[in-house]
Every structure is written in C-alpha cells, then in structure tokens.
C-alpha cells in the first residue's frame, strides 16, 4: 500500500509536545523553552503501532558557561543521560542521538540547567522513519 503524499498546501510544520506523522515519517519540534534549574519537558508523546528509526537532537545556542543535562526517557525509563558543559566562548553544539523506538512507547525529552537558576532557551527535535504501520 503506497503512502499518501501530503499536499504542498497542507500545514504540517508546527511545534509542541507531540509527535506528528506524515506518510512513513514522523517528527516533533519542541520550539524554544526556557530551561532553568529544574527538569523541563521539551517533547512528550506515545508512539503509534510502527517502529521508529530516527534521531533526537537537543539545541542551545547561547554561550554562558553553564552546564546542562539532557535526558531521553522511554516508558519513564532513562535511555540517555547526557551532561553538556558550556563555555563562554562557544555555544554548546547540537547533540544528535540515533534511536530505535519500539511501537507504543512513551517518549519524553527533557533538559535541566545544572549550574544556574537562570532560564536559557533550548530546543529538541525528533525525526524518523516509521516501519511496520
């Protein structure tokens, strides 16, 4: 069965907590969120019936010298715990992680400022190909 194409006039680009599906692909873009010294959810949703082979990425573009923790959860279990140490000279580069996400999995991406209570803008994205739908 061939996937239906999304018409050019359709608006499929948006931000928010959820995963969106277009044909055999999925994506989620968090938009910018202020991250301070408590864990902030950037993306959260439960996947559908297909397996997702994809990538997650965290972004932060303001050089402040602060340290941040990025977490990826599957069904409330931590599958990735990354601490990025900042410098005042260069921003923390994009952190890019390959993922295989099983069907019907609750996925959550979070960030936390470990060095300061100052709020800093962060983004997260999840993109992938969906198999077995």
Regions picked out by a protein language model, each given a short descriptive name:
Residues 1-133:
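Beta-strand-centric surfaces of beta-sandwich/beta-rich domains
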């Amino acid at each position: 069965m061939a996937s239906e194409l999304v018409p050019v006039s359709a608006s499929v680009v948006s931000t928010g907590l959820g995963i969106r599906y277009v044909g055999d692909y999925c994506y989620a873009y968090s938009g910018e969120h202020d991250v301070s010294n408590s864990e902030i959810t950037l993306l959260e949703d439960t996947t559908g019936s297909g397996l997702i082979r994809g990538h997650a990425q965290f972004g932060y573009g303001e050089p402040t010298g602060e340290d941040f923790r990025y977490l990826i959860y599957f069904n409330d279990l931590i599958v990735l715990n990354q601490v990025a140490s900042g410098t005042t000279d260069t921003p923390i580069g994009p952190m890019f992680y390959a993922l295989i996400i099983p069907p019907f999995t609750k996925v959550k991406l979070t960030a936390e400022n470990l060095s300061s209570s100052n709020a800093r803008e962060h983004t997260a994205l999840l993109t992938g190909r969906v198999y077995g739908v």
